From Swiss-Prot:
Gene3D superfamilies linked: 3.40.630.30
GO function terms (MF aspect): protein N-terminal-methionine acetyltransferase activity; protein-N-terminal amino-acid acetyltransferase activity
Subunit structure as annotated in this protein's UniProt entry: Component of the N-terminal acetyltransferase B (NatB) complex, which is composed of NAT3 and MDM20.
Name this polypeptide is given: N-terminal acetyltransferase B complex catalytic subunit NAT3
Domain (N-acetyltransferase) ranges: 2-172
Organism: Saccharomyces cerevisiae (strain ATCC 204508 / S288c) (Baker's yeast)
Length: 195
């Protein structure tokens, strides 16, 4: 049985089963603490009750999000949504995303849209987000470039391993103004992503 609960500082010691995975982005401790302090209601975990006595409530995944922007750009940004390999393929990522949507579509947040960035070559994640109602708003060329790659010098050179799709889902108060049907054809540089 899955429960959704607020993420607590001590949970950082219980997420190895989630974070020690090549598909999961890891951050410095202060980054996690910043989210717990500033956006505590948008940083939550899924826990599983198991029969194993060493894990009373096994953390199966978590959602890290924040609110940002002003006026028409007021939105929730998903920084990380991740599920432990053992608990994948049982719709936990969908449950975490749906929980976030329910929370931020109403006051005190009442955002216009939810957005996230996903590597252009991550077809599994893209399909999941599309199933949840997200669509590509634009392609951010060179979003995942390393220091060795340098900053992109043209929008014409795309690389599915280095570029990100900025995916969005419009919320009730937005009425689809923050999404576009032809998002894959719109390209921008990483510095153009400002809220």
């Amino acid at each position: 049985m899955t429960t959704i609960q607020p993420f607590e500082p001590v949970d950082l010691f219980k997420t190895n089963n989630v974070n020690l995975d090549i598909l999961t982005e890891n951050f410095p401790l202060e980054f996690y603490f910043e989210y717990m302090i500033i956006w505590p209601d948008l940083f939550f975990k899924s826990s599983e009750m198991t029969v194993d006595p060493t894990f009373k409530h096994n953390i199966s995944g978590y959602m890290m999000a924040k609110t940002e922007g002003k006026t028409t750009e007021w939105h929730t940004h998903i920084t990380a949504v991740t599920v432990a390999p053992r608990f994948r393929r049982i719709s936990l990522a969908s449950k975490l995303c749906n929980t976030l949507e329910t929370m931020t579509d109403v006051m005190p947040h009442e955002v216009n849209f939810i957005d996230l960035f996903v590597k252009c070559n991550n077809q599994l994640a893209i399909k999941l987000y599309e199933k949840l109602g997200y669509s590509v708003y634009r392609r951010v060329v060179g979003y995942y470039n390393s220091a060795e790659d340098g900053y992109p010098d043209t929008l014409k050179k795309v690389d599915d391993n280095k570029d990100a799709f900025d995916m969005r889902k419009a919320m009730a108060r937005d009425r689809n103004r923050s999404v576009r049907p032809d998002g894959r054809s719109h390209k921008c540089y990483p510095h153009d992503v400002r809220f």
